[in-house]
Amino acid sequence: MELERIVSAALLAFVQTHLPEADLSGLDEVIFSYVLGVLEDLGPSGPSEENFDMEAFTEMMEAYVPGFAHIPRGTIGDMMQKLSGQLSDARNKENLQPQSSGVQGQVPISPEPLQRPEMLKEETRSSAAAAADTQDEATGAEEELLPGVDVLLEVFPTCSVEQAQWVLAKARGDLEEAVQMLVEGKEEGPAAWEGPNQDLPRRLRGPQKDELKSFILQKYMMVDSAEDQKIHRPMAPKEAPKKLIRYIDNQVVSTKGERFKDVRNPEAEEMKATYINLKPARKYRFH
């Protein structure tokens, strides 16, 4: 859940930075799980031209965030590289915490030998350098914070930086709406804000594995549950009307509704005598 919250906060901040007018309602747990899965497949090395399909990733993000394809490919690659580093650091912290707690629980059998002054100086220098790097990282993280996050942290001390960024990104930078969302989530009960895995309200927390599976099936699996209850009644074929026959002067005519008819004048016998029959006469042969 911690890794998914890091991905969601970074993705929302990235989209709001490069697409201020984009609709963030399409960013849900499904796309966050997809991005987290892509980063886990890439490993700690991060994206490269060999193991990362930029076109497929851009096409997938374009379906959820219209306009994502207009962001330069280099900017997207830098964001994925940076996010991969953040996830690797978070995994290292999670792995170090159980080990440190186990070491603290053990009772030392023999006293540690005294350290030399040279080793003490080297450790002091390394600790000072590590503290300087941590301070630089904190300064860079503060520079990347969305405007208004510090106000939310002052009003809600129990709210973390990732939660404040999440809510502010969902509210599209509107501070009043973000405060209202946090208040409505906090009214559900103080138990919703206790524990490391329950920092966000119920409606802002990501679902569990079973809930995510049922959510994906419900949203993308097309199953008509009422199909067995339907009765198929096909339309009866239209029968062609019977052809009507009309007669005019004892002659069969069409049914198009003719209004006029050729009227031939009777010919005289003298005129008929002038006609020539071009058809030759039949020859009758008797065998």
Swiss-Prot record:
What is the official name of this protein in its record? CUE domain-containing protein 2
Which CDD domains does the UniProt entry name for this protein?
Answer: CUE_CUED2
Q: What is its main location?
A: cytoplasm
Positions of post-translational Phosphoserine modification: 110
Q: Which UniProt keywords apply?
A: Cytoplasm, Nucleus, Phosphoprotein, Ubl conjugation pathway
GO CC, sorted alphabetically, is:
cytosol; nuclear membrane; nucleoplasm
Tissue expression = Significantly up-regulated in breast tumor tissues compared with matched adjacent normal tissues (at protein level). Levels inversely correlate with ESR1 in breast cancers and are lower in low-grade tumors compared to high-grade tumors.
Keyword Repeat present in the record's keywords: the answer is: no
**Subunit and partners:** Interacts with PGR. Interacts with ESR1 in the presence or absence of 17 beta-estradiol.
What gene is this protein translated from? CUEDC2
Query: Could you tell me the Gene Ontology terms of the biological process aspect for this record?
Result: negative regulation of cytokine production involved in inflammatory response; negative regulation of macrophage cytokine production
Noted disease = May predict the clinical outcome of tamoxifen therapy of breast cancer patients. Patients with tumors that highly express CUEDC2 do not respond to tamoxifen treatment as effectively as those with tumors with low expression.
| Record Pfam families | CUE
Query: Which regions are flagged for Polar residues bias?
Result: 92-104
